């Protein structure tokens, strides 16, 4: 499972960015081996709370090296929504992705 920090992009104002774009959007510096090992689900965290959960159906590496996921809302991980994040980030942390 990947846990991503979407605090900067989570759609607080409808129309700015969809939840799907925020969570599945383009992520930098993801290792191929770790994608294969942990790439079954993606949990999104905003301000310390789980806000979305997706089952990953696939992914593509873009020309700029970033990874874009394809996925669907997860029934299995949906109960985590509204719960505290399973991982923590320190303020100013550069890596918005954690592997769990």
Give the ranges of each region predicted by the language model.
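Compositionally biased, charged N-terminal/linker segments
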Residues: 1-39, 45-50, 76-100
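Short, solvent-exposed secondary-structure boundary/capping segments
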Residues: 61-74
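Short beta-strand-centered aromatic/proline hotspots
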Residues: 51-60
